Amino acid sequence: MAKDLQVTTSKVNDNQTQLTVKVPVEQIQNKVEGRIRNVAKTAKIDGFRKGKVPVSHIRAQYGAGIQQEVINDVIRDTVFEAIKAEDVRAVGMPNIDDVKLEDEFLVYQATVEIFPEIKVEGMSDIEVERHTATITDEDVDTMIENLRKQRQEFAEKEGAADEGDQVTFDFEGSIDGEKFEGGSAEDFKLVLGSGQMIPGFEDGIKGLAAGEEKTIDVTFPEDYQAENLAGKEAQFKINVKKVEEAKLPEINDEFLELFGVKEGGVEQLKTDVRKNMTREIKNAARNQVKQAAFDALLEKNEFDVPSAMVDQEVDRQRNLMMQRFAQQFGGNANSIDKDMLPRELFEEQAIRAARLGVLVSRVIEENDLKVDQERVETFIKETAENYEDPQEVIEYYTNDAQQRANIESVVLEDQVVDFLLEQGKVTDKEVGYQELLASQQQGMM
């Protein structure tokens, strides 16, 4: 810590601490004088040769500004030393105020938000429902049918559009007779039953054939993302140009080769599909029970988190969504207007994530949990199995310290889940494959 730095702390509230920092005024004066002399050596001022400007002239003309610069630098250099010296677990940047230059000290106050000091309660009272699933032959057949649908092609048909058909049409929307932005399109393609449009839109198209027109009445949902449209009644004029029905590919050698099956025919495809589904439900089951355990832990521990932690989590979630948008639609994530993703979209989940982060950290500290390196190695190997060259992936995670640290963090979080399940009451429930996947997704929302 800087020489002769004096620090006292006082609690503002459960999430804030205030530090009063005193820096000997001699340190300020010495820095100011040193900087004035340096300026005098290089200053170009009319009437003086370069380097010959009297120090007294620099002090008189620039001294106040130089002193303020030095004070700002000293505060910046000492505030984090003070935080560290007082063992304050700060989150976010400190807020500096009440800066005073007294006869003996530069005095300032730094208010910082702090990591919540809580004791985890109710672990033995946690009740968790753990979902398990067994993959049936019917599940495998359904998955293969879905693989066929993913590669389906559409062929033009005569007659009315029905569920599963792809319809190409123009539409023009209006509210109270006035067109609105984004309410019109030409040659729009829609697979009926996809749920892509607002309620009532697809139903209005069913039964129409190519060349037919219709005006349909719909109501935008109350929670529609465009607030200016939410809850509004609208009319859409539809002009159907083409109706196509789906044609599923046959399960032949060509289809099998798409999935790397060169020998063994359909039975080998079923074996491979079952293997992938087994891995999928293993991950889904783990995620479901993790979310259930964390939800139960959050319910037993009510506390507020610093706004800085929530802000950081909002930024993290927003950046992830921007990256997903860029990957899905092309372009650079940095080019996406953040105003399109307002804070309100993320705040509820951000608060939950921040609170959960505190609880997980406290469970680890209170129970002295250490990362299990054997589990880390197993995690790396299982991850590597999904790649073409597993050994290369293993070496990557083994040799890259940051990547290994990320995996250790994931594994340690899994160990926290195991610890919670050991402390609480767990009830197993057998569910179907699709239900397990759905319960996992619900928990992640």
From Swiss-Prot:
Q: Which GO terms describe its biological process?
A: 'de novo' cotranslational protein folding; cell division; chaperone-mediated protein folding; protein transport; protein unfolding
Q: What is known of its domains?
A: Consists of 3 domains; the N-terminus binds the ribosome, the middle domain has PPIase activity, while the C-terminus has intrinsic chaperone activity on its own.
Question: What Gene Ontology terms describe where this protein resides (cellular component)?
Answer: cytoplasm
NCBIfam families, per this entry?
tig
Molecular function (Gene Ontology), one example: peptidyl-prolyl cis-trans isomerase activity
Classification from the root reads: Bacteria, Pseudomonadati, Pseudomonadota, Gammaproteobacteria, Moraxellales
An example Pfam family from this entry, by short name, is Trigger_C
Q: Which InterPro entries match?
A: PPIase_dom_sf, PPIase_FKBP_dom, Trig_fac, Trigger_fac_C, Trigger_fac_C_sf, Trigger_fac_ribosome-bd_bac, Trigger_fac_ribosome-bd_sf, Trigger_fact/SurA_dom_sf
Its biological purpose:
Involved in protein export. Acts as a chaperone by maintaining the newly synthesized protein in an open conformation. Functions as a peptidyl-prolyl cis-trans isomerase.
Q: What is this protein called?
A: Trigger factor
Q: Which UniProt keywords are present, listed alphabetically?
A: Cell cycle, Cell division, Chaperone, Cytoplasm, Isomerase, Rotamase
> Localized where?
Cytoplasm
What catalytic activity does the UniProt entry give for this protein? [protein]-peptidylproline (omega=180) = [protein]-peptidylproline (omega=0)
Give, as one word, the top-level EC class.
Answer: isomerase
Give the Enzyme Commission number.
5.2.1.8
> Which family is this sequence assigned to?
Belongs to the FKBP-type PPIase family. Tig subfamily.
